[in-house]
């Protein structure tokens, strides 16, 4: 049984249907990813509501999944470390990452990435389009960069221009993990997406994002 679960969790998608426990995990993952994908952050009421909804889905998922005593102990230990990290840093990120790992039993990794890619793509492009259409606030920062004096950096709906560019990096990570391309297709896709990287850079002027994408 343990061997079967291990193989399944490494990305097997032999099962054609979605079990309830799997659906609740995807809901948990999608809610948190969408919240971050549209630029929500800690301290915002909407982000807190997303955390509550996601945690509810996580609890339901855990209740629907059979666990051995040892697995439950491991989950509790991991969650305890997540809580300690939150208490010491004030950031929810570590605790959320722990939940993502702790709830993975009976959930194929590749399906998780497919759900994540779909959610992040919708969140990323909808945020940018709404910002360009002036439907949501667009933060502008004036910095002295590039030896050109003061320039304007735009966030395109995100909390900070750096967050905009990092969000694009995450989009690329999803794409290249899931894409099954031959050498020629990979070169073309890389060139096009790197062109998108420079387009985002024109707004963000984020060296961090530019370097991450290049690496």
What are these regions (language model features)?
Residues 40:
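Flexible, glycine-rich phosphate/dinucleotide-binding loops
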Residues 11-36, 47-66, 70-215:
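Hydrophobic transmembrane helix bundles of membrane-integrated enzymes that assemble
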Residues 1-14:
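Short, intrinsically disordered terminal tails adjacent to the first/last structured region
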């Amino acid at each position: 049984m343990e061997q079967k679960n291990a193989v399944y969790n490494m990305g097997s998608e032999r099962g054609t249907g979605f079990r309830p426990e799997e659906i609740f995990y995807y809901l948990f993952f999608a809610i948190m990813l969408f919240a971050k994908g549209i630029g929500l952050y800690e301290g915002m009421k909407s982000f807190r509501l997303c955390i509550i909804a996601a945690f509810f889905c996580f609890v339901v998922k855990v209740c629907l999944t059979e666990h051995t005593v040892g697995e439950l102990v491991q989950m509790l230990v991991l969650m305890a470390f997540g809580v300690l990290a939150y208490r010491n840093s004030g950031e929810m990120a570590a605790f959320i990452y722990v939940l993502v790992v702790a709830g993975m039993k009976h959930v194929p990794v590749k399906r998780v990435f497919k759900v994540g890619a779909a959610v992040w793509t919708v969140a990323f492009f909808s945020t940018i389009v709404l910002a360009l259409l002036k439907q949501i606030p667009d933060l502008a920062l004036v910095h002295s960069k590039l030896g050109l004096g003061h320039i304007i950096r735009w966030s395109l709906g995100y909390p900070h221009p750096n967050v905009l560019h990092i969000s694009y990096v995450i989009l690329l990570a999803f794409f290249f993990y899931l894409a099954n391309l031959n050498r020629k297709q990979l070169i073309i896709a890389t060139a096009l997406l790197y062109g998108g990287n420079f387009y985002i850079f024109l707004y963000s002027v984020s060296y961090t994002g530019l370097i991450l994408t290049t690496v």
